[in-house]
Amino acid sequence: MNIRHVLRTLALVAIVAAGLQFARAAGQPGTVKGYVIDSSCAFTKGLSKPISSECAVACAKAGSQLVILTSAGTIYWPISDATPAVGQNSRLVEFAGKMVVVKGKVYQRSGSRAIVISSVDAAK
């Protein structure tokens, strides 16, 4: 095997890896069902659902970011794909403490999950 062949193979592997990384970063359409809960309680209290809607609203109004907590315990961070990015609490606060179905573009990176919201509806 000559050095030119090795370099071509390495270049091809790098191009494929970059393409896969880009595809993963692009996000996929998805649906998430879970409770709208403030991020502090989701992490520090180990809750499986919000204490109350009033508590979640109060925390959101105090600046805590609202997240979606699934029944499996997965936390989805609502994010914006706008530049500059904008917070998503205003889209979720009316559902704080309640079960919702969120549709949008789902992203995953190093164990973290996020969703760019296209629609939010109360779960039935």
Predicted regions and their residues:
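Bacterial N-terminal signal peptides that target proteins for export
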Residues: 1-11, 18
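Residue-level detector of alpha-helix boundary/anchor positions
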Residues: 12-15, 29
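OB-fold and OB-like single-stranded nucleic-acid-recognition modules
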Residues: 21-124
